[in-house]
Amino acid sequence: MRGRRQEDIATTSSAPSTSTSHKKKTVSSNGSFRPRTQSNPGGKMEMYDHFYKNFQRPPMAPVYYPTSEEFADPIEYVAKIRPDAERYGVVKIVPPSDFKPPFAIDKEKFTFRPRTQKLNEVEAIVKEKHTFIERLVNFNRYSGLQFEFPVDRDGNVVDLYRLHRIVQNFGGCEEVNDEERWRDVAREYLPKEQMTRGVPSYFINLIRAHYNLHIEPFNRNLKEKAMKNEDESDDELEELKHKYQHHHGTMRSEPENTDGKNTEDVEEECPMSMQSGRRRSKNKKPVPAKKSSNGTPKKGSRGKKNSKTEEDEEENEDVIEQVYCVSCNEGKDEDLLLLCDIEGCNSGRHTYCCDPVLDEVPEGEWRCPKCIESEDAKIGLDWGFYDAETEYNLNTFTEFANKWKCDYFGVDNVSKVSCDALEKEFWKNVVSHDNPVAVKYGADLITSRVGSGFPRKEDKHTGPDSKLKQQYANHAWNLNNMPVLSESVLSYFNTGISGMMVPWVYVGMCFSTFCWHTEDHWTYSVNYNHFGERKIWYGVGGDDAEKFEEALKRLAPGLTGRQRDLFHHMTTAANPSLLRSLGVPIYSVHQNAGEFVITFPRAYHAGYNEGLNFAEAVNFAPIDWLAKGRECVQSYSNVRRYLVFSHDELLFKMIEAMDRLGLSTTLAAYDELKRVIEKQKRLRQFIAQLGVPARNVEQVAFEKIPDEQRSCRFCKTTLFMCALICNKHKRMTCVEHHDHLCKTCTPKDYKYQYRYEIDNLTHLFDELGKRTVDTAGWQEDDDDMYTQEEMPKLEPMVDLYNVEEQSSSRQKNQVHNIIAIQHTAKSAIEKANQLLFKKVRTRTKTRCQRADTRTDADGVKSLIEQMQGMDCNLSGLIDKLQKFLDQIDAWRSKAQIMMSQEHKYSKDDFEHFIEEGDEYDIKLSEIEELRKVVGMKEWSERAIEITSWAPTSNMEKDIDFEYKMRYTNKDVIALIREGSRSSSNHTSQLIAKLQHMLAEANKREAEATEYFDNPSLDKLQSIWKNLRTSDWFYEPYINLVRFEIGQIAKIKSMIDSTIPALSGLDLKPQLLRLGDSSITFAKAVELSKACELSKTLHKSQEHSSLLELINRMNLFTERIAKLFKPMNSYHNLFEIVSERDDLTPLAEGQVLQLYYQGETINSGNEWHQIKDFDSLEQMLHHQSSLREMQSRIFEKVKQTNSARGLEGCCCLGGNKSDSSESVLSCIMCESQFHVRCCEWSTFFQHLPKGCFMCVRCLRGQRPVIDDVANALNGTPSGCMETHLVRNLIQKSRIITQNLMDCSNKRQSGEVASDEMCKKALFDWLACEIMNPNGLPKAVELIHEFFGDYLEKQASAALELQQRPVKSKPSASLFDPKLNSKRKRPNPSQKDSSKSKSRKRQGQISPIDYCEEETEFKSCQARSCLKPFGDSVNWVMCDAGCKNWFHVICVGFTLREINDMHEYRCSSCLDHADSPASSVSTE
């Protein structure tokens, strides 16, 4: 066992964004309004992290302490506390001290197999991420796509779920593609510390390519599935999901096939068998579905997979078999036809008909979309819960559980772990990836098999405590008895229902959990902790159930969206603190041994165990549940969940026993039957209108049919009152879902079955009515007795009591009132104790204790007088009551003083004083008066907040300018009306000011309305001067003007960095001068979109000027692309025209993947890297720095490439077929390539034969310098894109002149070393513009310096020139996946794999990104190459100096560094006495 783990847990990269925007008025608890606010949409997914790392416990639910008399009847006591307790969802009841039932189980003989729970697989947010990843992998795998998790240059696995959520927050893949926002997506994804030098281009290309190839087809498949008609149910899938409903209801047996799957469904649905078909090799022809000779699909045809029966052969012996594609319905291209690998599925598709399209027949398994969907639906159904083989008894499990907890927390006794520490640790564990925790839980053990913790009536009670066992075997709170108490409607079932009427027991250990759920049929439940440590509960009141469901949908939309009945599976946990932050009221209960917990109808509840314990639970259903139960049936029908029992059947079982029903039960059954009759009349009228023939109507005793054979095939409701039948296909639905019964038959073919004639129902209704009248007579007599002015005599009360005892109606409340009057003295003592000792007995103030039963100060006096008049001696209790009354009088006196001098006291003072008064728990009229004072103080605060509102000088530039809290006309009127109740001078002054401000604001609203008749910038500035003073006002047209101002301010802030201007909102000069400024295309587009949102600027002169600028920039991009970009380009224009930024990682030996750019030219994509620069000066300085670095590092690149050999080819050495003569070496970087992996460039025609440049060194087509200069004519002079091209032209002229000077000096005999000439030649070859003036000199020098190279490569170069151009370019180059088949990394283990693959990089410097002139100074190499860029890697000396070095400065590649056991620098090697394990060359 391990010790306690560390605190820091990486949790919430998987959490979805849930921020929403709203402008509606919110109401506080006291009914007053709050100013509206607007949240920021699209928040980060890490926003929930603190809820798990620093868990905040929800408030505690009430604890109830019944007296022995109250405890005698559990149903009545629950009914008594229900008005107050129900809103908490779950409450605790502590029984009287004399309730000590013996534990009736032999711990040694009690054996069970607990299930294993993996805590980090049950939390909703984490579970959604894991589910998404597994579904994505399965979809790609079965769709025939080679899928691997993308890895960035640092070896980090890209979090695809997080990437998916970010793309969805940006509007989805289509919008991101259209709006060219992949850079924004990457920026959102990458950590902030990696943004110092912008977003790496390779990463943008990586995520764009992977998303479009693997994730978007998966999302598209989900959308298409959602758009299909969801009306048809998938019976097999529903049964599968039903098995994973971890509810207390009995597991349904497998239903018989009543749906006729051998008919039309064969055509519609693909079988869900999980048996895999035979694997297909690449050369094997697939055998898809077949057609008969007339072109129609053959039913039952299975291709080569099927073993035909003799009947099939006879039926089809004359049919000519033909394979065909179910998408295009064609049988051509049989070698490209795929057959689903699921045994028994006929579905076939061409590779080019698949979505996504497949380039070739896949080697692995391929499944049709329907079978993929079937597999997809099963993912995640039972995650987190696994069956175990180890069997325990209670003693051995106790030993295991206690040892596990002690080992985990590092203590020697389980009692030494605090509740708070354990609770915080639990919520960290549910999201822990680094240290997953698995525990065991003996859950849902049925007592009929393993035994109950309570003695049972049917058990044999022996031993010295046999009488005690017999006593508790009959106790009302014995969970074996509660469901069948006469007041529980479940008692009318003749047989028990496992988990509902027959208890289940639970053996828990530390952290074992039960996830969020409601009870079956929304019944009550009761749980008793027999022994052991605490059980922690969280509850949500039934009235807040929909809030809970909506919150969980926001947190995990992927889970709730794919499972209609997610909330009926006990498999999903969610953080209560997080749910509370989303507006869900949640309360907590700590259940100790010997305590009961009650859950109320539709109350969601969840929790965990602090350690070993043994609990028992069962359901019960008082009469008030009946209406909730019917509502539940409708809810189950909506999500197509099976019922545990038929609600209507239960009702009629009660009606059959009407002689035994009490008044309240009779009334409830009467109301329910009335609804049933009304519904049946409507349905039978509808059946006649539907066209079901009268001869097809029959009466059926549904209760005699097994439940699984009388369920609606669509909504799964167990039918009892009526049903529709399709005789031909043996199908059944409820009348409401008649349109899902059959697709081929008509209502004339249907059969309508019903349980009761309408006359029978009416008769039963009348009989129930008579019984309500009889019992009502008893009620009237009882009421008359209590309304008499004189105290009723004892004799009539006893007579009335005897009448009720002989009756079957059991009017318990009235009988107890009679008994209470008979025991007046006892009642008075109980009242006194309740007043004096309430804090001990209730712990929390609840309405149950203070609503109907609370007395006032006069009542306390009367009680004292009553007790003084009794014949018994109660002086001690009377003295305590008198002291209590004196305290109340003192409090009331102080209340009068505070109200008369309220200006001296703050609102908090009054609130604290009110709390003191509430502690007395009696009616005090002063409390209401004090609350009014508090209300007026709150009113003053809100009024002052408005009246003190003043505009600030630059408020328009505030980030939250548009979203500040403001007030509507109705808000202020309501505030004025509320304040008018007070007559104080202070209030009157505030009201007058509010009225004046409101009048002025309404005038401004009228002015704002007129503005939009003819908006303009000039008018906007003028009107805003007046409106600024009423900025507090929130009305439609002022809001619109405010939006316009905010939009103008945003646009101005975007332009100010480019074209500084004076303060104010005048944009005209700036917008009209944009063409001359250093603006980028991306910023121009962003400005245009901002203008389109503004009614003032949209289609204005200024906007038209901006659109013209964008059009000119697009034309410029098209001209430049035509000159520079080859037909199959793997670089965008920026990467071609700019200096190279890939030299450092290449020198380190990293593999940099290149992605095909596509045929279309998009200005946003071609120049998107320019976004990273804040100014033109910064961009040009960056270009200069890259150019300087190139001269320092390129030799290192050559050394690395030479050492790699053909591993540097774009196939990464995977192509072994070419001979040595078919290999080309790049004249510049010396990387080697197979000829078949290369492309011919027209630029090679200008160079000597045999001269070759690789795809990295020759990125463009090398246009002539004059053509490029001409392309700049008419382009915006100041745009950064044009400056970048001009910079390249200028560079070309300089290096060409330098080349010519070196060559001329060499020819004239002047000093011009070979190295100088080689460098000049290198610079000329590296420039992406060809200057013809330098071409002859370059050719001359190439012949002189590289003669042997040209001769060696002549044959391979000729082969390249003669080879035809590829018709379809590769999607990517230098792709590791094309070189080897690697095992797919497990997302849950990505952190550990990362640390392993970066053994040396794990120590790589804290400087993730090198700045250009500064950060390289920290490198301690003797000759630092001064690299910088996005991915400069460092290594630390493992010897004594601990200095840091650039990897490329120490003479090793990154792979070599990672493979070293340790690294020692040269300085440490010089001082070492023994040989080092590695050598340094820095």
Curated annotation (Swiss-Prot):
Name the Gene Ontology molecular function terms of this record: DNA binding; histone H3K4me/H3K4me2/H3K4me3 demethylase activity; zinc ion binding
UniProt name for this protein: Lysine-specific demethylase rbr-2
Mapped zinc finger ranges (PHD-type)? 322-374, 1206-1260, 1416-1471
Residues holding Fe cation:
517, 520, 605
Skewed-composition ranges (Basic residues): 277-288
Please state where this protein is localized: Nucleus
Q: Which organism encodes this protein?
A: Caenorhabditis briggsae
Q: What keywords are assigned to this protein? A: Chromatin regulator, Coiled coil, Dioxygenase, Iron, Metal-binding, Nucleus, Oxidoreductase, Repeat, Transcription, Transcription regulation, Zinc, Zinc-finger
What does it do?
Histone demethylase that specifically demethylates 'Lys-4' of histone H3, thereby playing a central role in histone code. Does not demethylate histone H3 'Lys-9', H3 'Lys-27', H3 'Lys-36', H3 'Lys-79' or H4 'Lys-20'. Demethylates trimethylated and dimethylated but not monomethylated H3 'Lys-4'. Involved in larval development and vulva formation.
Sorted alphabetically, which PANTHER family does this protein's record hold?
LYSINE-SPECIFIC DEMETHYLASE (PTHR10694), LYSINE-SPECIFIC DEMETHYLASE 5 (PTHR10694:SF33)
Identify the SUPFAM superfamilies for this entry.
Answer: ARID-like, Clavaminate synthase-like, FYVE/PHD zinc finger
